[in-house]
Amino acid sequence: MNEKTHRVLEFDKILDKLKGLTASELGRELVLELTPQTDYRVVEKMLSETNDGVSCIMRRGSPPLGGITDIRMSLKRLDMGGVLNPGELLRLAGVLRAARRLKGYINDKLDENNASVVKELISCLESNQRLEQKIDNCILSEDEIADNASPALSSIRRQIKEQQASIKDKLNSIIRSTKYQKYIQESVVTMRGDRYVIPVKQEHKGDIPGLVHDSSASGATLFIEPMAVVEANNSIKQLRVKEQTEIDRILAELSQDASLVLPQLNANMSIMARLDFIFAKSKLAIDYNCICPKINDTGKIIIKKGRHPLLDPKIVVPIDFWIGEKFSSLIVTGPNTGGKTVSLKTVGLFTLMMQSGLLVPANDGTEMSVFEKIYADIGDEQSIEQSLSTFSSHMKNIVDILSGVNNKSLILLDELGAGTDPTEGAALAMSILECLHQMGATTLATTHYSELKVYAISTTGVENASCEFDVETLRPTYRLLIGVPGKSNAFAISKRLGLTDDIIERSKEFLSQEDIRFEDILLSIEKNRSEAEKEKMRAESYRQEAERLKKDLEDQKRRLAAQKESELRKAREEARRILTDSKRQADELVSEMKRLAKEQEEAEVRRQTEELRQKLNKSINNLDDSLVESIMPRQGLVKPPKNLKPGDTVLIVNLNQKGTVLTLPDKNGEAQVQAGIMKINVHISNLKLVDEQKQQIQRTGMGKIGVSKAQNMSTEIDLRGMMLSEAVDVVDKYLDDASIAGMGGVTLIHGKGTGALRAGLHQHLKHNPHIKSFRLGKLGEGENGVTVVELK
């Protein structure tokens, strides 16, 4: 592909736009090297990387390309062992920063499973934040090294500042001194040759001892360094030398650190240049609303709503174009400024862009072919608006084309055969087209010659096309109509402009019958095409309406299905909820029934216990009645307690058992008394307050009952082999009897074993009202195998 083809198709202007979208000189260099490729696989890869860049920008926004500078010369110096200056090191740090930011641009969570050219390139970048930060911390600008770049540099600069302050103090004291003030030209401290001086009047140079470093333009002022600060200025100069030495050492150290990662830096430069180039192509595609076309190498081109990228997008008319299936040569006819050349250039420029890895401004469904050669004869330096070139210029270009054309070539010929005798020009044009067609080239030509229309109609593999012209408005519509030959429209245009019918009819008489018939055929074809297009548009409208109705019905069907599914889901959820509630209610009912059964069982137990208690009380009362006769003679000696009240501790005389008064005596003289675990009704005559017991104890004979009970009971009980529940019942009965018998203490034998019985008994004994305390047995008593209980 030659430079002339690029120029006439204005591909260089596309490259200029692309160059303006790069972020670095490295990217611009790659743009300048960009040329259309002829290898199908290479083109496919280039398009893929551009399309991938578009996807990245659409998902993540513009990439962080700032800081990509050309440091290749600095890297060469490092490779040769050189030391970089502060500016070079800052630019190197900027490149490292750019690499780090680019690595952060790709977020694996967004497309961790997707292969990506951009992602692969970025993953190959090497960041070195340690070196980047070290350079940034040490170097403030191209002319300034930070004080904290090293401890030595910080110390040197501190000493310099101290010396400078000391010198200024001394010089200011001289300036302010009444002794020297009259010799001073101006009360300022200034510098000459990096040394602090003061301005002294010329006539008093001998009055202030020192070194003269400079004088004013008039000679009236001498800049003198007083001897008092000469040594301090010398010290500063020496410190400056040390400062520069330390700075050189710091720069050498940073350069050495950078040289250790030289291979990574060189690789980063190449990768970032490539990324800048890819993203520039992607930005161009986004700016022009481009798509990635499907590609082939068979010569087939299908362009859907293609827009020439160099025309104003507000006025450009999209074209629909196809070639390479039923025909490989297309002849476009029609009036000038009708859009023929624009169509020609659009096809050619799209092909160059696609084969350079650039996306094309068209709609989805566009397909482009990869050609080995692209030739264009559109006149020297011709732009879209320029006039045609001369016949000789055309022929020279065509000769060059014919010498190199093959079946993988795209040929673009504008106004083929123009600039000479129409008859000869038409004959030459047909011969050239026939030659190109026989060679298998894909050819697109524009012409004014009617003979070429006939050639296209009569030749297999060749097709007519035209650019539509609106006779009513006398303006072209710029629409490309493939399959329809163009008309000159001279008579129609003339009539619209006011030419009389007589002249127009007379002019038609000069035409041959063949021309008239041909024009009539074209008119008929155009009329039929127009009607067919209207019918097509109407059919398309009906189709779209049918599609819309179909879509509406499908949407309605989906909505109904979704609604049905939703209702079923709600019904299932409601049924599930009802089942859950029913199960919960059933569980609650079962629990309630169990609770009621338990309460009923407990009530039955309480009833039986109460019956037993009543039987016991009846037995006790019977016992009281049977003993009345033997007791009464002795009771007569006992006085009933006076002012008896609930809570008083009394002795039940006939039982010799202590108790607590619960109620006041009733009309029968009986009070309810708590004796151990039993509540019994006792006549007040059978009660005695405890504090009166000692005075009256000898007068009663009831002690015989307790003594008799104690004589019949054992002081210990063996519980070994019993279950805890069984042992608890036995112990309660035993302790009741022991308490009634007035025993002071008893021993429970439970054995050692696992200790479970002992632990359970101890827990139960804590709540027994008869017990004062309890403990495990001591040595000789049975130790852990027994529990000794002290009763109240």
From Swiss-Prot:
Source taxon at top rank: Bacteria
Record text on subunit structure and interactions: Homodimer. Binds to stalled ribosomes, contacting rRNA.
Gene Ontology annotations of biological process type: mismatch repair; negative regulation of DNA recombination; rescue of stalled ribosome
Its biological purpose: Endonuclease that is involved in the suppression of homologous recombination and thus may have a key role in the control of bacterial genetic diversity.
PROSITE patterns: DNA_MISMATCH_REPAIR_2, SMR
EC number(s) on file: 3.1.-.-, 3.6.4.-
UniProt-listed NCBIfam families: mutS2
GO molecular function: ATP binding; ATP hydrolysis activity; ATP-dependent DNA damage sensor activity; endonuclease activity; mismatched DNA binding; ribosomal large subunit binding; rRNA binding
Residues the entry annotates as binding ATP: G334, P335, N336, T337, G338, G339, K340, T341
Protein known as: Endonuclease MutS2
Keyword Nucleotide-binding annotated: yes
Organism per entry: Ruminiclostridium cellulolyticum (strain ATCC 35319 / DSM 5812 / JCM 6584 / H10) (Clostridium cellulolyticum)
Pfam families: MSSS, MutS_V, Smr
Record keywords, A-Z: ATP-binding, DNA-binding, Endonuclease, Hydrolase, Nuclease, Nucleotide-binding, RNA-binding, rRNA-binding
Smr domain residues: 717-792
Family as reported in the entry's similarity comment: Belongs to the DNA mismatch repair MutS family. MutS2 subfamily.
